[in-house]
Amino acid sequence: MDKQEAKHINMPSPSTCEHKSVEAYLFIDPLCKDCWEIEPFIIKLWLEYGKYFSIRHIVTGKVDGTNASSHKWNKPANIRFVWEKTTSLHGFSCDGKVHMQEASSTPYLVSMAIKAAELQGRKAGSKFLRKLQEYIFLENVSNPDCELLLACAKDSDIDVEEFKKDLYSASAKKAFQCDLKFTNEMHITEIPSLVFFHANSDEEGIKIAGTYSYDVYVQLLKELVKCEIEPEPLPPLEVLLEATQFISSKEVAFIYDCSKQEIERELKKLQLKRKVQMIDVKCERYWKWIAKEKDLV
């Protein structure tokens, strides 16, 4: 989700704090389930505090320690290593922590595909990544091939022809190499990991490895912003569903801090209005947005 969605999602209004004063980097492996299950935390954080920070997904991989540059954030002294473990919370994290040296490396083509989608914008890249993870974890696709990647591009509503050109392009390759280099510079040894920096400060950044309670991420953001910040009201349920297109009852319940029973009562009302389709996958209930934009009020 980015600024382009402002017409659908009520973006935060200006405040006394500096706009987008924090830069966040989420280090992921698209084949790691924990990296998929952290997404509800990121969505909720963005909806409530998105005016204070920007976020980028960084695709990790095997990196060479000799490639690190002399960037001001490269030195370990400039990153405060906060929590280095993964905790199972809210029923999302299910496989425990995944150390870089133990994880199987993501196929090169998959990483290139994510970068190719991002060449059409961060919003396009995020939509493509989410669709790819749905195929991997809900359809049991362990090694996505070119055909599936093209299907993800189509399902994500990005320019498929442009995606085909970019898939093997020098631009996508360079973008992926930059991700690998940055992963090395930040000394990422566990995924998912979040690194926060103040955009206009030489102060140390904060790294949090693994998955924690939502309040932890909010507290870290407040610490970096250095002024009182207040959450924006969450958007109406229909707006969230249109923005995400496909989301589980569990994710929606987490975002709105409600029980699954409460959320599903509201979702079933939308189902009766033919705005969503209910899909049961792996003992979990998902909801697909099927209404046209003109149906929204």
Swiss-Prot record:
Coiled coil: none
Compartments where found: Cytoplasm
Protein name as annotated: ClpXP adapter protein SpxH
GO cellular component, one term: cytoplasm
Domain of life: Bacteria
Similarity section: Belongs to the SpxH family.
HAMAP family: Adapter_SpxH
Transport is among the record's keywords: no
Keywords: Cytoplasm
Main function: Adapter protein required for efficient degradation of Spx by ClpXP under non-stress conditions. Interaction with Spx stabilizes Spx and exposes the C-terminus of Spx for recognition and proteolysis by ClpXP.
Pfam families registered for this protein in UniProt: Thioredoxin_5
InterPro entries tied to this protein: Adapter_SpxH (IPR046404), Thioredoxin-like_sf (IPR036249)
Subunit structure: Interacts with Spx.
Gene3D superfamilies found in the cross-reference section: Glutaredoxin, putative protein disulfide isomerase domain
